[in-house]
Amino acid sequence: ETDSDFYGAVIEDAIQQAHEMGASIQCMAVTDDISYDCKSTSSSAALDESIYNGGNCDRLVVVSAGNIETTEIDASDYIESCKANVIKSPAQAWNALTVGAYTEKTVVTDDRYKPLAAPGGISPMSRTSWSWRNGLNKPEIVMEGGNVANHPVLQTTTTPNLSLISTSADLAESLEPFYATSAATALAVRMAAKIKTVNPDLSLLSVRGMMVHSARWT
């Protein structure tokens, strides 16, 4: 396991290696275990510096906002859970495009459970910058990240019906459920790549700007 003091160096090296391989749009769906309440960390500083890249600004790094575990969700008022659980490092980086999760998924096949979030609402697993007071608003955009199923007695849980789907690392299973801000970040990277492919002359700053400023309120 990498010591947290070296997270910044690892991030810089990974972004540089990917850039040298031709990946100008990069996905970072991993965060620190700790939230630093928008304070700069070695991770976020390294991310900012790598994206700036000496003024070239020739990289777009899309970062997940971080997840709330289902055991930490207050089903009686999950919006307050989202407000109370702040974005994890390094997603507070100013130059990164930070992605949270919302959901349109509300179909549950198990009659004992009900979807917790209404269609178009923030995903119960998505963190926010609600408590920050430094003028930095994160995430900049949200994408589909799935919902959770709630039972008045049993534990709140994720279900395949309320999740997205992706290829599996398990060789015995070709597909598996995919949810929360990692899934949302993957969708955002896909969108960025499609915009850049159709408009190859656009700068990556323009791609980011188009994604943020063309977003609609959910």
Annotate each predicted stretch with a short phrase:
Residues 1-35, 39, 74, 211:
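Subtilisin-like peptidase catalytic core
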Residues 1-7, 35-37, 56-58, 92-96, ...:
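Subtilisin-like serine protease catalytic core
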Residues 26-29, 61-66, 99:
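Active-site neighborhood of phospho(di)ester-bond hydrolases with catalytic His/Asp-centered motifs
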Residues 31-33, 66-70, 102-105, 147:
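Catalytic metal-binding/acid-base residues of hydrolase active sites
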Residues 42-58, 85-89:
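Catalytic-core regions built around general acid/base machinery
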Residues 68-92:
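Glycine-rich, charge-decorated loop segments at or immediately adjacent to ligand/cofactor-binding or catalytic sites
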Residues 85-189:
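Extracellular S/T/G-rich loop segment that most often corresponds to the catalytic His/Ser-adjacent loop
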Residues 143, 189-197, 213-216:
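Short glycine/serine- and small hydrophobic-enriched flexible loop segments
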